[in-house]
A protein has these predicted regions:
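A generic short-segment signal for beta-strand/edge and adjacent turn/coil regions
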Residues: 20-22, 35-36, 56, 125-127, ...
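Hydrophobic alpha-helical transmembrane segments in integral membrane proteins
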Residues: 170, 174, 193-210
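Short, structured interface segments
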Residues: 186-198, 292-298
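Ferredoxin-reductase
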Residues: 203-297
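Intrinsically disordered, low-complexity segments enriched in polar/charged residues with Gly/Pro
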Residues: 37-39, 44, 60-62, 132-134, ...
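Detector for methionine-enriched segments
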Residues: 1, 52-53, 166, 204, ...
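Membrane-embedded alpha-helical bundles of multi-pass integral membrane proteins
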Residues: 2-194
Length: 299
């Protein structure tokens, strides 16, 4: 228990360092001309919000050594809550700047709009759609697959737009150390995205499972019994959940999260998932044929 607490504390400190690093670096090196307090405060909120948004790729990468101290359900709850905080910071950024410098709302005489401004509008618009669809997906009757795909696209637009906006204005990027920090952060975010969408599916492709049994349960629930195909499987903790890719390759954008239902000590690497029919994807679970190849991400 003590080792888990230390492990968790270390990751929490590292997370805070990544979030606060842009603010610390703002004070280092060559400083641009000073501006009023509210403008600088708004810029600090924008930098922090962008850093938090980028690190969401890490929270959703499902690294076992990161999720182990808390559990994946806690990590995803944290992802949801911290995302709302990041969105609040990003939304506050332009509101405070325009309140402090209303002249910025005036359009240039030649009618052109700077690329940084267009990128900011795209980023904030994507964030607004992302929040609305995440909080009210069920009420809006958006299917899980469509929501998950759009969630990824909107997140990429939001973060990408924020980066272009930052580079477009580049007020604090003249100093080499500041540029180096943001180049490093962006490279980290891209690496995390590639890990989730390329590297991890490659590992899953080499470690498939086969449906060994499809068992009907009470309450319109079906249990899928799966056994590793050509490998020893993986160990999981009681209550842990994994992502099931049932029809398609592990490179498919959407995996469906379900809890593992058997004991973590099940023989032969066997895993089971008891899935209740809630419509959409789950309505066809009982039709899965024995012997079908599936992919599990439980790491």
């Amino acid at each position: 228990m003590w080792s888990y607490a230390v492990h968790g504390a270390v990751w929490l400190v590292l997370y805070l360092l990544f979030i606060l690093a842009p603010l610390f670096v703002l004070l280092a090196g060559t400083l641009p001309p000073a501006r009023d307090f509210w403008t600088e405060f708004a810029v600090a909120l924008g930098y922090s919000g962008l850093a938090m948004m980028g690190l969401q790729f890490g929270l959703t990468a499902r690294f076992r050594f990161v999720t182990r101290p808390w559990g994946e359900d806690v990590i995803y709850h944290f992802h949801r809550q911290i995302s709302l905080i990041a969105v609040g910071l990003v939304f506050a950024h332009p509101l405070i700047i325009f309140a402090a410098q209303p002249e910025l709302l005036a359009r240039p005489e030649d009618g052109s709009v700077p690329l940084g401004a267009l990128a900011a509008v795209a980023s904030i618009g994507a964030l607004a759609l992302l929040v609305v669809t995440a909080l009210w997906r069920v009420r809006l009757k958006i299917g899980y697959e469509l929501w998950h795909a759009s969630h990824i696209v909107l997140a990429l637009v939001a973060v990408g737009g924020g980066i272009v906006h930052m580079v477009g204005w580049s007020f604090y990027l003249e100093d080499p150390r500041k540029r180096a920090l943001w180049i490093g952060l962006v490279a980290l975010w891209i690496a995390l995205l590639l890990y989730v969408r390329v590297v991890k599916p490659l590992f899953m492709l080499r470690r498939p499972y086969r449906i060994a049994e499809v068992r009907a349960e009470r309450g319109d629930t079906t249990t899928l019994v799966m056994r590793p195909d050509g490998h020893a499987g993986f160990r999981f903790s009681p209550g842990q959940f994994g992502w099931l890719t049932l029809w398609g390759s592990p490179f498919k954008i959407t995996g469906h999260p379900f809890s593992f239902s058997p004991s973590a000590e099940a023989a032969g690497g066997r895993v089971e998932m008891s899935i209740r029919n809630l419509g959409d994807f789950t309505s066809a679970i009982h039709q899965v044929p024995v012997g079908q190849r599936v992919y599990l991400d439980g790491s």
